[in-house]
Amino acid sequence: METFSLLMGGSPSKMFHLKEFSEKLEDLGMECKVVLDVDYCDGFPSRKISKWVFKKNKLPNLISEYKPDLVLVDRQRHFGLEVTKTRIPLLVHLRGDFWKEIEMAKKTIYKSIPKKIVINEWEKIGEKCFQESTIILPICNYLSNVVKNRYQNKKIQTMYQGINPENWFETKGMKLKHPCVGIL
């Protein structure tokens, strides 16, 4: 049986979920590598102005060393944009309504000229990632419908974001004398 290798690039806040997902895929025989996307690829626009001047693109080295069959991104930024320049299939995991978020950002906190430039560039990068992706993986049916309305010919598959409660809560069994659903 052929083994596939998957490279996952994600944001710091999603590392936990990507690592957990990677462990499940490895249990199924897939080879996975999870990286912080900005460690390998960053530049204009970025919240850190220093990244505008000192661009980072270590992604070609990572790709040549790891040789992934697929790349999954959990946000639409430089990492995904650089993957679109390769022949490697790009899977985009969509966790929110990207277009509504951009629209609201433009109306609220990104009104100044420098911030307008940044948000417009983020929008262009996002659109390029979506357009060039092999498949878009929204986390719910609502988002799948949003994507279908924007990209009628794009492969879209809902990938539900399951949450394992054992990661946050200690679960101790309860000893019930008379278990019931409710009082009759």
Locate the predicted segments by residue.
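N-terminal subdomain of nucleotide-sugar transferases
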Residues: 1-40
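Short N-terminal targeting/anchoring amphipathic segment
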Residues: 5, 60-78, 83
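Conserved donor-binding/catalytic core segment of Leloir-type glycosyltransferases
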Residues: 6-7, 137, 173-184
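A short, charged, and often flexible helix/loop element on the N-terminal side
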Residues: 36-62, 109-115
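Acceptor-binding helix/loop patch of EC 2.4 sugar-transfer enzymes
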Residues: 41-45, 92-124
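Membrane-proximal helix-turn-helix segments that form the acceptor-binding/catalytic region
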Residues: 61, 113-136
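Helix-loop-beta element that forms the nucleotide-linked donor phosphate-binding surface
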Residues: 144-163
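Acidic anion/phosphate-binding donor-loop and adjacent secondary structure
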Residues: 162-178
